[in-house]
Amino acid sequence: MVQSQGWVRRYFKAFCKGFFVAVPVAVTFLDRVACVARVEGASMQPSLNPGGSQSSDVVLLNHWKVRNFEVQRGDIVSLVSPKNPEQKIIKRVIALEGDIVKTMGHKNRYVKVPRGHIWVEGDHHGHSFDSNSFGPVSLGLLHAHATHILWPPKRWQKLESVLPPERLLVQSEEDCL
């Protein structure tokens, strides 16, 4: 009986040591390096959730790349919603600071993206709440860079950083006139 209590005590002690090492490492990894997220909604179709409401893609979000604001045109990023800080949204980077972009929708105007900001849009233009609605987004709202689709298994793939052909940038301010 005494032997069995000693074994239980050693096991419990080893478990506690492992737990108190593993939890901080896991939390740090998920906060600083990468995490996974489920994508909901139709705003990024056909790139994400091509099946509509029947399926939700799960993506790998890499925190490392956005840590130094290393974003490129075409990247799919996760960011804090400028209209609801409790919500994270996923959009494609269309323009960087200093770029001139033509807005989509009823306004059809030109906007020069200010310093420290980016222009983001959903791939499904008619169903996306994006920079066409709320304007340029501060780089400080960036959360992560979506790099891969992890689920469902048939959609496993690397997400490419490509600009949609209809969203080519305005080359100069003269092109706006």
Curated annotation (Swiss-Prot):
Native organism: Bos taurus (Bovine)
Any single GO BP term: signal peptide processing
Catalytic center residues: S43, K91
GO molecular function: endopeptidase activity; serine-type endopeptidase activity
Family to which this protein belongs: Belongs to the peptidase S26 family. IMP2 subfamily.
Pfam families for this protein: Peptidase_S26
Membrane-crossing segments per the record: 19-37
Subunit structure: Heterodimer of 2 subunits, IMMPL1 and IMMPL2.
Keyword Transcription regulation: no
Enzyme class: hydrolase
Subcellular location as annotated: Mitochondrion inner membrane
The name this protein goes by in its record: Mitochondrial inner membrane protease subunit 2
EC number, UniProt record: 3.4.21.-
Protein task: Catalyzes the removal of transit peptides required for the targeting of proteins from the mitochondrial matrix, across the inner membrane, into the inter-membrane space. Known to process the nuclear encoded protein DIABLO.
Main location: mitochondrion
